[in-house]
Regions:
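Short FAD-binding loop at a beta-strand-to-alpha-helix junction that anchors the flavin cofactor
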Residues: 1-13, 17
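A short alpha/beta connector and helix-capping loop motif
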Residues: 13-28
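Active-site-proximal substrate-binding core of FAD-dependent oxidoreductases
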Residues: 7, 26-99, 104
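C-terminal lid/capping helical subdomain adjacent to the catalytic/cofactor pocket in oxidative enzymes
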Residues: 75-250
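Alpha-helical context
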Residues: 3, 7, 52, 56, ...
């Protein structure tokens, strides 16, 4: 959980203070429980496993992604995705005291189709998409500005962590709801990129867990086909700097 045996994030965007705060939260909780005479063996082991799972799920946003700096459209899409994923899962868990709620953590991590497993797999596949797209994003897109809060779903993710509190059942329901939104964001991002690179239809049905810009054959226990969502599609126009495909949803 902490110290030399702990985990630390690459400072791609920041110095990793989020993982420091998570580590401090677990450490403080364990110390308090130990001082009260509680047996903390299982809790310590479980916190360690959750810490590693969150770390492994999050590291793909950094690994081998430095070449994407300077790729304007890729980095806009990537930063918006990274923020959305972070706010809707990681931060929401922290701000609702979920890191020390064993029952909640068990429900989020149990099984290959658990929320945390799906989240990690989806996030990793999105980072593959950004990596594959990077060398193809060569346009000089200057004098453009896009605000993340022009996208309603990012605004909602932020409001959920700043203005609201959830009990355990509400939090699980919110995670499930957010995962569906993330799946649609991932699928719509792929449609935009694939249309730009390969000229494919914007009405393409996409599996966000197995999608590949290079046509790689990928398998997933969480595989699902995602149809186009009108609201998500409309919102994502605000982050697309290239000319938008002619046939779009109204």
């Amino acid at each position: 959980v902490t110290g030399e045996s702990g985990l630390f994030a690459d400072p791609f965007y920041s110095p990793g203070s989020d993982f420091i705060s998570m580590s401090n939260t677990w450490t403080a909780d364990l110390i308090q429980r130990d001082l009260k005479g509680e047996d903390i063996f299982f809790r310590t082991k479980f916190y360690t496993e959750v810490n590693k799972a969150l770390y492994d799920n999050w590291m793909p946003i950094y690994i081998n992604q430095y070449p994407l700096w300077g790729k304007t459209q890729v980095m806009v899409a990537k930063i918006f995705w990274d923020w959305g994923a972070y706010w809707s899962i990681n931060t929401l868990l922290f701000t609702n005291n979920g890191l020390t709620d064993l029952e909640l953590l068990k429900k989020l991590t149990a099984g290959p189709r658990s929320i945390l497993q799906k989240y990690g797999e989806l996030s990793t596949n999105m980072q593959r998409l950004f990596s594959d797209w990077g060398p193809l994003d060569t346009a000089d897109l200057t004098e453009r500005y896009t605000d993340p809060f022009d996208l309603d779903f990012l605004k909602q993710f932020q409001e959920d962590i700043v203005e609201k509190e959830f009990n355990r059942d509400e939090l699980i329901a919110k995670f499930e709801e957010n995962m569906v939104i993330l799946e649609h964001i991932a699928a719509e991002t792929f449609r935009l990129v694939s249309n730009k690179v390969h000229g494919t239809s914007m009405e393409l049905t996409v599996d966000p867990y197995t999608m590949s810009l290079n046509g790689e054959d990928r398998k997933s226990k969480n595989s699902k086909e995602v149809l186009r969502d009108a609201h998500i599609a409309k919102e994502m126009r605000n982050m697309w700097l290239y000319p938008y495909p002619e046939k779009v949803m109204n």
